[in-house]
A protein has these predicted regions:
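Membrane-interfacial, low-structure loops and terminal tails that flank and connect transmembrane helices
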Residues: 1-7, 120-125
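Membrane-water interface at the C-terminal end of transmembrane alpha helices
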Residues: 106-125
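Core segments of alpha-helical transmembrane spans in multipass integral membrane proteins
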Residues: 20-26, 42-66, 75-82
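Membrane-embedded alpha-helical transmembrane segments of multi-pass integral membrane proteins
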Residues: 18-31, 60, 79-90, 104, ...
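Membrane-helix boundary connector in multi-pass membrane proteins
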Residues: 67-100
């Protein structure tokens, strides 16, 4: 049986990781801070779209941190796991710093998502 405390703790961890990572990342992208911004490439519409996605995840994470509803957290984490685990393929590298951090964060989110699903399944019985 998955305890509510373990699930809630990991939800806080995942959302906190999102917030802690995305505040500086969005700041770097918005202010075009060099040399850090070079990891994401030059300012282009594609980078603007990426920033929009990052800002959306940041805002959702902050809102969900205040109201930790597992049914709302689960789809956010599932989407992040998918996009983070596909970045090595789309970037074509396992050594890019963004790819490396994406894989690490996906692992954390996968544990959280597993706990949410296990808890919800146990609650449904």
């Amino acid at each position: 049986v998955i305890s509510t405390n373990n699930m809630s703790r990991m939800i806080r961890v995942s959302l906190s990781v999102n917030i802690a990572v995305l505040i500086p990342v969005c700041t770097v992208l918005i202010l075009n801070i060099r040399p850090l911004v070079d990891v994401w490439g030059p300012a282009t519409p594609a980078r603007g779209i990426l920033l929009s996605m990052y800002l959306s995840i940041l805002l959702l994470s902050a809102g969900l941190w205040l109201r930790r509803n597992p049914m709302l957290v689960a789809p956010l984490l599932a989407m992040q796991i998918c996009y983070k685990l596909t970045t090595p393929i789309t970037v074509g590298s396992l050594t890019n710093p963004v790819v490396i951090s994406n894989i690490a964060i996906a692992i954390v989110h996968a544990v959280t998502l597993w706990l949410i699903v296990a808890h919800l399944r146990a609650s449904a019985k």
